[in-house]
Amino acid sequence: MEEELVVISKSIVNPRSLKKPTSVKKIQLTPWDLSRLRFGYLQRGLLFHKIEVKQLQASLSVALDRFYPLAGRLVKLKNDDDTVSFFISCDGSGVEFVHAVAKNIELSDVLELSGSVPGFFASFFPATGIKNYHGVSRSLLMVQVTEMKDGVFIGFGYNSTVADATSIWKFINAWSEICSKDSSGSQTFQRRLHLKGWFFDEIDYPIHIPDPETKPTSYVTTPTNLQEKMFHVTKENVLKLDAKANDEADQKISSIQAVLAYIWRSMVKHSGMSREEETHCRLPINMRQRLNPPLEEECFGNVSQTGIATVTVGELLDHGLGWAAMQINNMELSQTDEKAKAFAENWVKNIKIPVSVGSKDLVVTNSHRFDVYCNDFGWGKPIAARAGPPYLNGRLVVFKGIGEASLDFQACLLPQVVEKLVKDAEFNEYVSIV
């Protein structure tokens, strides 16, 4: 189906007040940002019945007035010690905007998305194959609107040195509000954008690092024969797993921790890994309120740290759901100001810029806390939310479900793991596989 997508136009959308100087010209990158330079742009998207492309572009220009870092570019400076430094220039260079048509693809093709990747769906996203360090010449946010036979998909890719998922969804929320209500004059929109600033007092900036464009010394091999499936957990089953985990645990477990632990154990059970091997659950942690002093909840930027729960396969399978959920809970509780700053100080002393993460991990991205279904651009609420490349074995993208308190997960797994999960009666008791 990929060849059936036709690009109608490519353009640059600049902030509406391009000639008006922004309050901040330069944003320094923290160790959290710099460590992601070799990662690909993160890509998300929303499915609609109808959208007007010109109105989308016009409202995007207005939204970029407030969220001006997204319209900037990375700047790379060469240092005398054979290192480089990066910062974000808030120069209003603009956002790449693609208008495409795929008239033979229907809403059902996306809603029932299942099977091998990349498949046709990868072409619905604008930043496939682009790394964060490419932000020196490519826009830090990219948007693609694809008109289908009976619907429209808005795909966007973003550079995770400029924003984390919390910030990018706040931007999408604001953009949709502007588009639907022309609310650019509202008090909320007129407030100054709070940036994260510099909160690593013991670290001088700009940080000198090896050039991320040079060939890395080691690679994490990513399987190419991956499949995607949507996992759906109803409100009733979320509550059942929550109750089961809390009955078995000696500490308070949240619903999302219980569900993630259940999926983690099930995936590892069918992974073929030996009992002695380590498995990890990687989870993004919003650090805004965990830092000391805490940052504004609304502050814009990448203020996300990856928390990692580590156990052996044997430990995970020998213990119950409650124990697995406690490992995730303890990991989250350990994400403190002291730990964050210790990580940053150690990273500067021993700089590592990974290409990817381990292929035997459960890599959780996004969050059920993001209200993706409130993003009505003026033609109705989204039908569905989806994620695009990069594809990674063990990737689990979390979305709030359409049904009250339900959860959706876009899983990327090896085909043999998918096959076993489909046949696993215990797994299917709580999780519906689409």
From Swiss-Prot:
Keywords in alphabetical order: Acyltransferase, Plant defense, Transferase
Pfam families referenced in this protein's UniProt entry, alphabetically: Transferase
Stated name of the protein: Protein ENHANCED PSEUDOMONAS SUSCEPTIBILITY 1
Principal EC category: transferase
Species this protein is from: Arabidopsis thaliana
Swiss-Prot/TrEMBL GO biological process terms: defense response; regulation of defense response to bacterium; regulation of defense response to fungus; response to bacterium; response to jasmonic acid; salicylic acid biosynthetic process
Family assignment from sequence similarity: Belongs to the plant acyltransferase family.
Induction (UniProt): By pathogenic bacteria (e.g. P.syringae) and jasmonic acid (MeJA).
Knockout mutant characteristics: Hypersusceptiblity to both virulent and avirulent strains of the bacterial pathogen P.syringae associated with impaired pathogen-mediated induction of salicylic acid (SA) and reduced pathogenesis-related (PR) genes induction. These phenotypes are reversed by SA treatment. In the cv. No-0 but not the cv. Columbia background, defects in SA accumulation or signaling enhances resistance to necrotrophic pathogens such as the fungi B.cinerea and A.brassicicola, leading to small necrotic spots and minor chlorosis, as well as reduced fungal growth.
GO terms of molecular function: acyltransferase activity
Function: Required for pathogen-induced salicylic acid (SA) accumulation and SA-mediated resistance to virulent and avirulent pathogens (e.g. P.syringae).
Keyword Transferase: yes
The keyword Transmembrane helix belongs to this UniProt entry's keyword annotation: no
Active site: 376
EC number: 2.3.1.-
